[in-house]
Swiss-Prot record:
Its EC number is 3.4.24.-. This is Putative zinc protease AlbF. Zn(2+) binds at residues 66, 70, 142. The keyword Transcription does not apply. SUPFAM superfamilies: LuxS/MPP-like metallohydrolase. One of its GO terms (molecular function) is metal ion binding. Induction: Transcription is highly induced by oxygen limitation and is under dual and independent control of Spo0A-AbrB and ResDE. InterPro entries: Metalloenz_LuxS/M16, MPP/UQCRC_Complex, Pept_M16_N. The gene is albF. It comes from Bacillus subtilis (strain 168). The active site is at residue 69. GO terms for biological process: bacteriocin biosynthetic process; proteolysis.
Length: 426
């Protein structure tokens, strides 16, 4: 099947409805899937540390969204995991920077029993002081364990060096002092503001059944109401700092972590476009098996044994975290930027590799309902279709790629050099 036709087919299999309470239903059919994936996404994540109301703003401790996620596993004195397991379903939950998710997989004939249980728990929570105290201990332990994960620690340390006041610099579970400061009043205010039907999307992925047959009958569905979505944009990067931020021994730089601030490009501030452009660029620049890396390694005899990159791009800014190992690890960004400027005639070929890599990944991921959910959630978050994604990917041109290279070379950077001894211990 032609790639464009595949993305069109994804859209044809997508059915978006709303309940009368405002709950959004995102149905994506996949005939080959044996199980059905259900995910309720709440528009409340680790970045949400302020509740705005007519009576005034309420500041929340970091980690509030994640703490609520833990609490909502307890309903009427019972643990939801056990209730779902009794129905042959495995319930999980996770909090990201932008939202909170409750996810489970199930046989199709069990959804009419499990979905009402989950929605009842999310909409009708009763706060219990004993459970709050219990979860404070659990989450404190979780934070302490996360600090032992050096790679995770470097991620947040780099973002903190670049933007110390950003919520993105704080682990989603918060800090120990935040957990100690949380009280039931904070949690109740956050719950009341966030866990509203109009702030939720229920994803149903897999199978070929009509949406109505999978949902409990009391949920009356309507088509999407007429409205104009607000385009999500990303701001420009802050001014470049005069001083480079660095930790560790620059003389022993075989293991290097680099953080970069990224933002809007000249003439382009659309959030989804910037996300996809950086995804393509990362596949070109930071994958050991990419033609670009093979060329640059042979040309300059670079000794780099490991190379990986992750991007975090949101409406309030973006970061790229690069991890490289090898004798020339700390020089890679500068060398790569220079090589692109010297070989501009090859940009089209590199771009085609990056575009093919991303579109193939989406097509491959679609065979797995968990991965397919992530792309569906991106469509929902940016209010776009799968075909819109495809067109953004294909329309990326050489000038955009060169703008990314310029941004990468000139952006604020934070660097952590890890000693060889410490890297081996990890």
């Amino acid at each position: 099947m032609e790639k464009k036709a595949f993305f069109q087919q994804l859209d044809e299999r997508t059915d978006i409805r709303y309940t009368d309470s405002g709950l959004k239903i995102f149905r994506l059919k996949f005939p080959r899937a044996h199980l059905r994936l259900c995910n309720v996404k709440i528009d409340f994540g680790s970045r949400d540390v302020c509740i705005r109301a007519e009576s005034g703003d309420t500041l929340l401790p970091y980690g509030t969204a994640h703490f609520l996620e833990h609490l909502l596993f307890w309903h009427n004195g019972r643990n939801l995991y056990s209730d779902f397991f009794a129905h042959g379903a495995l319930l999980n939950a996770f909090t990201t920077y932008t939202d909170t998710n409750f996810m489970f997989t199930s046989l199709p004939d069990r959804l009419r029993q499990t979905i009402p249980i989950l929605l009842d728990a999310l909409w009708n929570h009763s706060f219990d002081k004993k459970i709050v105290a219990q979860e404070k201990a659990v989450i404190t332990s979780e934070i302490q364990t996360a600090h032992l994960n050096h790679q995770l620690s470097y991620h947040y340390q780099l973002i903190s060096m670049l933007s110390p006041s950003s919520p993105a610099a704080v682990f989603p579970a918060g800090r120990i002092e935040d957990i100690e400061a949380l009280d039931i009043s904070d949690l109740q205010k956050a719950y009341k503001a966030a866990y509203q039907a109009h702030r939720m999307t229920l994803f149903l992925i897999g199978g070929s059944e009509n949406t109505e047959t999978l949902l409990p009958p009391h949920l009356q569905l309507e088509k999407r109401p007429d409205y104009h979505a607000e385009r999500k944009i990303i701001p420009a990067c802050p001014p470049v700092l005069s001083q480079k931020m660095m930790l560790g021994d620059e003389e022993r730089m075989e293991d290097t972590w680099t953080g970069l601030q990224i933002g809007a490009l000249p003439g382009q501030n659309d959030l989804l476009s910037i996300k996809l452009y950086w995804d393509i660029a990362a596949r070109i620049l930071f994958q050991l098996d990419s033609p670009f890396f093979q060329e640059i390694q042979q040309t300059y005899r670079l000794e780099i044994d490991r190379l990986s990159a992750e991007t975090y791009i949101y409406e309030d800014g973006g970061f790229l975290i690069l991890h490289s190992q090898g004798t020339h690890s700390s020089a890679y960004i500068d060398v790569a930027s220079y090589y692109v400027t010297q070989k501009k005639e090859q940009v089209a070929a590199w771009l085609q590799y990056g575009k093919d890599s991303l579109t193939d990944a989406i097509i491959y991921d679609s065979d797995y309902v968990r991965k397919c959910f992530e792309w569906a959630a991106e469509c929902d978050r940016c209010d776009c279709s799968f075909l819109d994604m495809y067109h953004i990917i294909q329309d990326m041109d050489a000038q955009v790629f060169l703008s990314l290279i310029d941004a990468m070379a000139s952006s604020n950077k934070a660097i952590i050099h890890v000693s060889q001894k410490e890297a081996i211990r990890q």
